[in-house]
């Protein structure tokens, strides 16, 4: 089976409300001097018999093309020389989807590497490499990453990531940043104002995709992705936002950001039928070894507790009973019910949940009474419900994968303080973004005995290797101011299966 995205713009009215520029405003005709594949290729959402292949056609300087639908030929082979071609065909790159291609393939042999390429406008794309999931897996190697700010650091960590030969790259949010930080030293410049409409978000993603390290990581490894907040606006919660925009206006901006995200990610188009409220959460099983659930912790959450409705902030536990109200949700009712069903049916030896924000309780001050409401601490009842599900006998060896806080953490997760842990949380630092300001988290270990490790001073990512009876994790730090920096290992974790 194969599908191509025939894009239906469900948000034209919303874009008009934002005063979005027409598609041609920043576009140009294709010329022979332009490389239509300047943004590279990518793959994602692997399954036992398929995956999604991505590319986007652009003009000179990675600007949008001034053109109608463009035919794109594709080839998929089990060998790099394309002697054993297993799929070939033609799809269309539609201008309403920024001439992006999302090719959803199925019916391929499991556990096989595959190579792919596209042909369009007289040019041929780089050759991408991906793989189908094995039926019986004895190992999964993945790289956990988040938070990459174009201006604040180089993306050289991807070079070290690829040296570890991962099966998957799991990106848990802040793939782009919408805003600049003028008080931080820059290594390069956005060259454009903060995006607020579809053209702006498209241009921001196109800029990111010109980075050679990021482009190579997409070319060589399949990705699983979810978003956090900076793909739209810092600390937004559903339609609550820091700028105080009315819900209809922020819904228009969010829909533009979501559309641009989809246009630049190797995501199955079947999850994006309603662009104004797409479904990003989904499950991926790695043979009979790992059950991995990708979660969306932004789109459906309740507003921040005990705050002006637009702003998440520090709250005192004794003064904010709202955070524990049972009707408050981080995932939304539909996603929470979907995850509960998935966990109830769990039978694999390892269970992974990948999501955007800090999950464990985190007391921030000397009294242990202050928490940050943007994290799961602002949604205590929802966290308790999920921990109860993770405590079921059939759910074993659970790992929560998180990002957002620009620092490394290793946390035990308990249903109650006097009970043994039901899961472990690994939090990756930013791949390229500023570290937290001094004192941001206080004396974390004094008031948080469930925290086993933290490093607040380094950027980088986490390598994770899972086998039937073993999990290994390396917290790898790299200097974000150098594209060629060598890694240092901050902590090595070895954990046996139950």
PLM region descriptions:
Residues 2-20, 26-498:
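Metal-dependent phosphoester/phosphodiester hydrolase catalytic core
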